[in-house]
Structures are given as structure tokens and as C-alpha cells.
Amino acid sequence: MEVGAKVPKKAGAGGRRGGGGPKKKPVSRSVKAGLQFPVGRIGRYLKQGRYSQRIGTGAPVYLAAVLEYLAAEVLELAGNAARDNKKNRIIPRHVLLAIRNDEELGKLLAGVTIAHGGVLPNINPVLLPKKTGSAAAKEAKEGKTPKSPKKATTKSPKKAAAA
């Protein structure tokens, strides 16, 4: 070919050099980030929510990763709670037990009410039945002291003066 002669372009090929090869299959941003949560949908919600005039490209990816991590953490703990109760299916009760028994999740979701979750079991130790001699000896051997309210352990002023 001569110098300066035009090279015919391939149909549909873009770019400076005319591109080459077949068109590649599009890859979603969720797949690129290695996430299960939808990055594109979260980005769309951020834009439609009018949280800001402009949304950076990394913001929906980061938010999707955080949401996926939190969901995985709650589901893992709820699955453990279901297994502890000898159940195969996670119900709202298991989710509540998982969240309230975890210190950090409990702090994060302190003001959240979970429908059909119930409450954490909490029985005052004074109301529990008395321990048998062998159980009390075993507990004393391990160095544990039974928890009881301060009122039950403090003496009355008359008894304190007599002693």
C-alpha cells in the first residue's frame, strides 16, 4: 500500500485503530466488584434519592459491599440461632436473637423493632430454682458466684448495726 492510503474500516468497530475481533459480552459492575448485591440498582437509588447532586462511581460499589457484609453477618448469626433451636428455617425470632446477642450489631440496630421477634429471655437469678448440692459445689469450684440483685445481698440497717 501507498503511504497515506486510507485503510478501510471494519463495520461497527470503534476506537482509533478500528478495533478488532468480536464484540465482548458486557460485564456488570457487581461481577467486577465480586459482589452479589446489585451495584447498578444501588447507584440508581442513590441518584433518584437526591442525596447529592453528584454521585461518584465508587459510592454504589462501596455501599453494596457494606450492605452485603451486614446481610451476611446477620444471616450467619441467625442461622446459628436457628441451629441452636434445632430448626432448619430462619424466622424473625432467630434474627432478633442474633442481633441482640451480638454487641456491635445490637448497638447498630438498638432502635430497630423486628416484627414477630419477641424479646430476649431474661430471668432474674433470684427467681430461678435453688441449685442442688452437687451443682452448687461445682459452680463454687469453678469460681463462679451466682448473680443476684444488690438489694438481696445488702443487709438491713438493723442487722448491719447488730453485726
From Swiss-Prot:
GO terms for biological process: heterochromatin formation. It is found in: Nucleus; Chromosome. Residues 147-163 have a biased composition (Basic residues). One of its GO terms (molecular function) is structural constituent of chromatin. Residues 1-30, 134-163 are annotated as: Disordered. A motif (SPKK motif 2) lies at residues 156-159. SUPFAM superfamilies: Histone-fold. Residues 12-21 have a biased composition (Gly residues). It comes from the Eukaryota. This is Probable histone H2A.4. It comes from Oryza sativa subsp. japonica (Rice). The lineage of its organism: Eukaryota, Viridiplantae, Streptophyta, Embryophyta, Tracheophyta.
